[in-house]
Amino acid sequence: MTTTRSNIKKRRSLATLITKIIILVLAPIILGIFIQSYYFSKQIIWQEVDRTKQQTSALIHNIFDSHFAAIQIHHDSNSKSEVIRDFYTDRDTDVLNFFFLSIDQSDPSHTPEFRFLTDHKGIIWDDGNAHFYGVNDLILDSLANRVSFSNNWYYINVMTSIGSRHMLVRRVPILDPSTGEVLGFSFNAVVLDNNFALMEKLKSESNVDNVVLVANSVPLANSLIGDEPYNVADVLQRKSSDKRLDKLLVIETPIVVNAVTTELCLLTVQDNQSVVTLQIQHILAMLASIIGMIMIALMSREWIESKVSAQLESLMSYTRSAREEKGFERFGGSDIEEFDHIGSTLESTFEELEAQKKSFRDLFNFALSPIMVWSEESVLIQMNPAARKELVIEDDHEIMHPVFQGFKEKLTPHLKMAAQGATLTGVNVPIGNKIYRWNLSPIRVDGDISGIIVQGQDITTLIEAEKQSNIARREAEKSAQARADFLAKMSHEIRTPINGILGVAQLLKDSVDTQEQKNQIDVLCHSGEHLLAVLNDILDFSKIEQGKFNIQKHPFSFTDTMRTLENIYRPICTNKGVELVIENELDPNVEIFTDQVRLNQILFNLVSNAVKFTPIGSIRLHAELEQFYGAENSVLVVELTDTGIGIESDKLDQMFEPFVQEESTTTREYGGSGLGLTIVKNLVDMLEGDVQVRSSKGGGTTFVITLPVKDRERVLRPLEVSQRIKPEALFDESLKVLLVEDNHTNAFILQAFCKKYKMQVDWAKDGLDAMELLSDTTYDLILMDNQLPHLGGIETTHEIRQNLRLGTPIYACTADTAKETSDAFMAAGANYVMLKPIKENALHEAFVDFKQRFLVERT
């Protein structure tokens, strides 16, 4: 009972503790808020004072400028007077004096201190006022010489007979309107020293208390009348101290004349008492608030002492009973709503904890997977029934069983690692003939490791399935590689005869005369091109399956791509009677950054499909670039719509499957390998884009391609050499060419093509023959085949560069479409790689490249 009373008495001191918290925690925070408020208020006051300074400075300078602008306007107007011009001829001084007297009487506020006129020889007239300021004729001549150009105001400090005088001087030319001759110059001068009228004007119009004009901190003029509680010296002292919260606010305004900052400065004086009073009131308000907070803290202590402590002690007694585990009790309630809520919540929490303890025990005991707890010294502490069953342990006396000892020996190294703090997952340790995958995790209590929990899973079946999967995967990889090797070999074997077919067909075009023969040759060319396209589709699909398709992004003009596509397919559509509409909304001066080759392949496949399956009607291709604010990439959207045969909506999902067309009759009627759309879908995925399709039977088809791209302003490049130059006119002289080709047909075609360019061609049937010819003869160009007997094309190229040390340009020709082959040729020293079958246009492009890179450098 004594202990309880002692505890209650101790808990009642919480009121004092809370009061201390209020004072030691809340009070500094509130005090900080007050200080911050004072600081910000002071900053606001300072900013307001600074703003007042800026506004007053700008206003006083504007008034100063406007005053001299008015004098300038009068000066310009007077200089055009006929009276002044007549003076230069008749020298009638009385008329001129009367003229200026009348002007001064009409507007005395904008009258200069003195005036004088000059001609090309010197001063011819002055109004006599200059002598009142100590300015004699010599000084007037000096002023005329110093203000010798433009018609702006000039600040001048001169030493006169009565001391230094600071003045603004301006001149304007006197022109003869009939001849435009400059008769002379009119000068106006405003003396700033003791210019009380100017000071009064600035004071009254700027609404300040007083104005002082200084030059290099020396006062020149002021508006003080003598009854102020300060003098000019006080104004200068406050200007240098810059006390923003002083009773007297002095604002300094440098005078800029003709865009040049002068030594002149205007000091304006304003009463700042209201700002100082506001600051004092704010400080007093802060002190009153602090006193109020102290009183509130003391009153809060008394209230807490009487109302809160007893209720809190009841709540603490309930928590102590739960901690001592003397049995679960119900909370008796509290008069304070918050304490009652806390007690009820604790009651629910204790119930949940008790239920969780039971759940954890059940989870541990009834789990089907073995679970064990080990000490950091690798001593078994506890295991669940599933672990006992697998380890053949019925009670703790059977831990010497061989199965358990073998398991412990293999698990111990991992237990030691976990005891160092490591968490291990996926550790395979068998129990008998079964393989278990174990996870080991250290149990941390207050930062120290108190044990290790080990959980296992039987993966015997999974391991066996993984072995079978690996065997099947290796077999599939072998099969895929064999198919790839077969396709690569067939590519070379098929391209070689296609090269002969297309080459001879292109040569025949130039030798036949009748239209019928030309049509027959066109059929031959189109058939060969179709066969080549089917072969390319099959090879591309094979590369996609093997993941050998490379994406190489670079900037290019999408408008050029659309123009090329239109040039190719518009004649085809015209001959077929199908309307081709191309709408390109991209700016011609914008380049996009993506893989140009793959994008071309996507567009050409889609347009080719549309042309193929649209017997009548139209094909519409629309492209636009969608840009989003803040996004790194833009989105290229290409929509292709045709009025072709379409496809059933339930078969749209099959469109992108390889070797699939809607009906077998479609292949017979329209042709195709069924790979075009498969390649399109895979290329779009590789470019991180999306393709959507809408179609109905007989209602046409719409494809929508969206690709993320980067765009930028197009850099204009110099025009390349035209590819329309006739072959015989491309080279200025006959070139000597070495052709290395083992196939007679290919050699015949290439020789025929080269003759059109007036080339002298030597033919070597393999690499060894080529090496012999190069040892004895100098050539301008080498055309190198890939698969050669005895010594391959890549090896021959390497020998020419490394052993013969020849720099002769080597242009390789290969039927192998693999990028690795092209890279190997370039690494061996080739300068250019062409793909068979060699077309006349492709060969022409290669020769144009050769001329630009090597013949231009040679000249």
Curated annotation (Swiss-Prot):
GO terms for cellular component: plasma membrane. GO terms for molecular function: ATP binding; histidine phosphotransfer kinase activity; phosphoprotein phosphatase activity; phosphorelay sensor kinase activity. The modification Phosphohistidine is found at residue 492. It is a multi-pass membrane protein. Residues 736-851 form the Response regulatory domain. It catalyses: ATP + protein L-histidine = ADP + protein N-phospho-L-histidine. Its EC number is 2.7.13.3, 3.1.3.-. Its main location: membrane. InterPro entries: AI-2_sensor_kinase/phosphatase (IPR053413), CheY-like_superfamily (IPR011006), HATPase_C_sf (IPR036890), His_kinase_dom (IPR005467), HisK_dim/P_dom (IPR003661), HisK_dim/P_sf (IPR036097), LuxQ-periplasm_dom (IPR015387), LuxQ-periplasm_N (IPR043056). Residues 489-711 form the Histidine kinase domain. It holds the Pfam family HATPase_c. The chain crosses the membrane at residues 15-35, 280-300. The modification 4-aspartylphosphate is found at residue 785. It is found in: Cell inner membrane. Keywords: ATP-binding, Cell inner membrane, Cell membrane, Hydrolase, Kinase, Membrane, Nucleotide-binding, Phosphoprotein, Protein phosphatase, Transferase, Transmembrane, Transmembrane helix, Two-component regulatory system. NCBIfam families: LuxQ_Vibrio. At low cell density, in absence of AI-2 (autoinducer 2), LuxQ has a kinase activity and autophosphorylates on a histidine residue. The phosphoryl group is then transferred to an aspartate residue in the response regulator domain. The phosphoryl group is transferred to LuxU, and ultimately to LuxO. At high cell density, in the presence of AI-2, the kinase activity is inactivated, and the response regulator domain has a phosphatase activity. Binds the complex formed by AI-2 and LuxP. This is Autoinducer 2 sensor kinase/phosphatase LuxQ. It comes from Vibrio harveyi (Beneckea harveyi).
